[in-house]
Amino acid sequence: MEEFTIYTGTTVPLMNDNIDTDQILPKQFLKLIDKKGFGKYLMYEWRYLDNNYTENPDFIFNQPEYREASILITGDNFGAGSSREHAAWALADYGFKVIVAGSFGDIHYNNDLNNGILPIIQPKEVRDKLAKLKPTDEVTVNLFEQKIYSPVGDFSFDIDGEWKHKLLNGLDDIGITLQYEDLIAQYEQNRPSYWH
């Protein structure tokens, strides 16, 4: 996983509440097992008019000024529903680095973090301000300081200390384990021979 320290990008507002994992990535795309390639299917039912991938010009992700946005501003209960990690894969593959919501489905919140996406919880008044940013306005998210810096104000956010450490250092669960490789080897060496 890449380190997440300070990130600057532009925003796209999708202010719906209760966007569930089936809306983020419909079930028919769960057959793929590689993390790459899911971005094409993100918000499939909203982004496309038909199965030929004809873009819906009214959907905000398809509007030219928002195509490069990497910070999603959204409503409450983002990522509720089934526990499919594929939804986080789709968000990451599309290019999202930060998601600002009123709340998250618990499992989806962890899936985002495990895939290098920073989920940030903010109240409605903050999200409403961020949703009014121009498509070219840059927002900086500083994980060290736990702050969002934007043209409409600066906002603090909370994050669990363990997750913060993992993101700042680019560590997934395997990376955390490998930090203790010497101790693990020593433990294995000291085990009785009948375990070898």
Curated annotation (Swiss-Prot):
KW Amino-acid biosynthesis (keyword) present: yes
InterPro entries from the UniProt entry: 3-IsopropMal_deHydase_ssu (IPR004431), Aconitase/3IPM_dehydase_swvl (IPR015928), AconitaseA/IPMdHydase_ssu_swvl (IPR000573), IPMI_Swivel (IPR033940), LeuD (IPR050075)
Catalytic activity: (2R,3S)-3-isopropylmalate = (2S)-2-isopropylmalate
One of the GO biological process terms: L-leucine biosynthetic process
A GO CC term assigned to this protein in UniProt: 3-isopropylmalate dehydratase complex
Enzyme class: lyase
E.C. code: 4.2.1.33
Keyword Hydrolase: no
SUPFAM superfamilies: LeuD/IlvD-like (SSF52016)
GO molecular function: 3-isopropylmalate dehydratase activity
Pfam family, one: Aconitase_C
Top-rank lineage group of the source organism: Bacteria
The entry's keywords: Amino-acid biosynthesis, Branched-chain amino acid biosynthesis, Leucine biosynthesis, Lyase
Pathway: Amino-acid biosynthesis; L-leucine biosynthesis; L-leucine from 3-methyl-2-oxobutanoate: step 2/4
Entries under PANTHER family matching the protein: 3-ISOPROPYLMALATE DEHYDRATASE SMALL SUBUNIT (PTHR43345:SF5), 3-ISOPROPYLMALATE DEHYDRATASE SMALL SUBUNIT 2-RELATED-RELATED (PTHR43345)
Quaternary organization: Heterodimer of LeuC and LeuD.
Function of the molecule: Catalyzes the isomerization between 2-isopropylmalate and 3-isopropylmalate, via the formation of 2-isopropylmaleate.
NCBIfam families: leuD, PRK01641.1
Family the entry assigns: Belongs to the LeuD family. LeuD type 1 subfamily.
Protein's name according to its UniProt entry: 3-isopropylmalate dehydratase small subunit
Gene name of this polypeptide: leuD
